[in-house]
Amino acid sequence: MRNFFKAISSGSLLVVSLVHADVGREEELDEAVRQFAAKVEAVWKECLRRPDVHTTHDSDMCLLTMVRTANEKVELKYQEKMADALQMIEHPDRFSSYEQVPVLLKASQSQWKEYVKLDCEGIYQMSVAGTARSGYSLLCQYKHAVHRLRALDEWF
């Protein structure tokens, strides 16, 4: 009976250690995304302070730069994850050949792009009568890109 309790205690300690290590990884990844967003947003705010930025169109151009930077980061991270997924195929194990991983990652990325397009177009259409409609849509795209960075981190 004593050995049984020792085994349970040892197993619990191992599980807690693994969960703690994963939480540490999650926190590091979250922090990296937060730092990226803070840096990009600081550049956007600096752009808005420029003396030649006067109109809604001018401020939208600053926002568009932020969206492009975020989308480039998403594409880079996606390509890194795809390279990892393709490498998994080269090293199958007794559990899986991993052939579906790149297929699913590609589908996930494609569907994410379609979702962002529809979601942000909806926001644009809701505010179509106003001058800030493009800004709302661009901000929507930026927020989705930052969220996607975090989501791609889930693809080990």
Describe the residue ranges of each PLM region.
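Sec-dependent signal peptide recognition
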Residues: 2-11
